[in-house]
Amino acid sequence: MGDLTILNIISFLLIFFIGLPHGSFDGAVAALVGFNKRFQFIQFLFYYIILFSLVILFWLYFPIFALSIFIIMTIIHFGLCDWTNFRINKYKYSVSFTYGMTIIFGIIFFNENQSFLIFEYLTNDKIYLIQKYFFIPYFLTILSIVYFIYLSIFEKKLRKGVIEILFLLIIFYLFDPLLSFAIYFCFFHTYKHLKHLVKNIYSNLTNKKFVIYSTFVFTVVSWFGGLGIIFYLVCLLYTSPSPRDNR
């Protein structure tokens, strides 16, 4: 992947210390969906850790399939979050698809070589088996953006989305994939996600102390986990040859 630059390190720090902790509200979300008793919350944590461990194992044995599922889930998550931010009851799938595809494949399109070097480490080089098919999501992304612009003619609330998408595409064009993702993840997605999440949590949960306590614990854990991942990546980049070198 080459040397780890200052911008790469800044990107990792932004993701782990600003973006990643927005998942720290998972404990509060669990309470919202029914895990609101002490024993139930312990059950949630148990399931959470088991699922996380299974995902890691699955990724190790089936990296291409796991990465594909991760990309699809990321597209859905980002897209739905951005659709919710518009506060409209229509065009759910069109808006979600456009935003999700634009974020993921916009970054990859403008930084394909660097993006595939990252995927190379995540999949042990096997990603190149499907690289030639990436023209399909690129084409679908362009079509979705054109359709989104068309919808904005009839729905005024979407017009700010056109400006936002164009602004994000400029960012993706100017910066490398890690920094591009960090900018979107931290300053666009996290802000929208937290705004929606905090509003729902504080209007539906009476135990505010639980929200604060669980969020604090999850945040600290995510920060330590983030530091561990950064340390691991630094060691990996400087001690291991690129998978491409083994071809």
Model-identified regions with their sequence ranges:
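Long hydrophobic alpha-helical segments that form multi-pass transmembrane helix bundles
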Residues: 92-152
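Predominantly late transmembrane helices and immediately cytosolic-facing juxtamembrane segments
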Residues: 184-201
